Amino acid sequence: MRPPLIFLTAFLILSCDNSSTKTKQEPSNPQTYFFEKLDSIIVKDVIARVFIFQGFHEGQYFFRDMASSKVYLFDQAGELVDQWNKEGDVPGKFSMTASNISFDKKGNLVLLDIMEGIKILKKNSDVVHDFRVYQNQVSLGAAFSLFDTEQLIQKEGKEYLIYSLDIIEEYNQKYDPEFLARRKNLLVTDLETNETKEHIPFPEGSLFLNGKVYYFRDLRPIFQYDETSERLYLMFKSEPILYTYDWSGETPELIDQQTLPLEGFQVFEGFEVGAIDMGQIGNFQTRPYPSDIINISKYGDDLLISYSPTPQDKSAIERVIAGQSSDETKIRLRKEAQMRTVLRRQNGEIVPVELPEMYYNSFKVDGNTIYWMKKPDPNTEAEEFTLYWGELKAK
């Protein structure tokens, strides 16, 4: 089952000189990795439309119904110990546009709702902070997933949330190359004060500085910050370049950029100015089966990078767009565009990872533990869900 897509519309109102030259690492596949299952837990009697694991914290498993604001807490035996929601006009409210849950050092739940703002809640749902959104959004398009689109980090004893929004600047409808040249793509919010700073312009040589314009989904940064090394690893969704930043100071400084040899990844060169509007997310008719960077997770000293390739059969894609394709062709193209995951080692080697069947085609990494959910029987209404966890193993 493909993850359901949300499409909502809301009518609301450094570059760096010391970066290294882009280098392309040749793929080196001495072996293949896979997820080795170590244990699992089953939670039962759950009535939820989009039930997704959020994290394991202080001996409890957290889940959400992503189609609402309902949160579930289970103990290590799989027994429900608490559930609550933040629907309606209540303090700390959030909706289906909220991110996955992160946990601060006090054990509070931190969520980013791109329409409502950052919410910090106690485990019993009491409100700690209820911050407004940094900038009102005009549209949203995303898939439900165990992958995180934000990260809670600590720097010099303070906690911050790093994330991105499609609309960061004041919305004035003007969309041109100058807009992209000025744009900073990462937001860093102090979780005590809600003070927010903008970081990470498109680096010199980036695809997005080529004089064209892009759908906003193409611009979205995918990132992972490592507190030990104080390195920020970042890629943009439609660009196969891994940017590495030294973030030991106040501002991230670009120190390396490498084009990764991701099999099947096709670079899109953009649209002429005026062809698309400001804030548009995407359009299958004009951007079918796009190659996307989906997720970056730190695993030990290495990176797990997930992406979706573009099918090679252009004539078949044209038939799909024209509505003249058979069901068999559509199924084949969907299969060719399925997500792939590779392990990018510290030495630059790219090693393929075999993925198990996973609910919502995604996983969550916490330290050296990988979590994923069992895919339910599509012909049965699921009321129990299995969560697996394990580690990466070489075949």
Residue ranges and their predicted role:
Residues 23-49, 346-353:
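A short helix->beta-strand "capping" segment at the edge of beta-propeller domains
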Residues 36-43, 84-94, 131-146, 196-216, ...:
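Surface-exposed loop and turn segments in beta-propeller and other repeat-based domains
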Residues 39-70, 293-308, 313-315:
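Beta-strand-rich domains and repeat architectures in extracellular enzymes and scaffolds
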Residues 50-56, 99-104, 148-158, 217-228, ...:
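Structural signature of eukaryotic scaffold interfaces centered on beta-propeller domains
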Residues 80-108, 113-115, 131-140, 357-359:
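Blade-loop segments of beta-propeller domains
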Residues 116-117, 123-177:
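Asp-box/WD-like beta-propeller blade repeats and closely related beta-sheet repeat scaffolds
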Residues 177-194, 322-347, 385-394:
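Beta-propeller blade signature
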Residues 287-344:
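Loop/turn-rich, solvent-exposed surfaces of beta-rich toroidal or solenoidal domains
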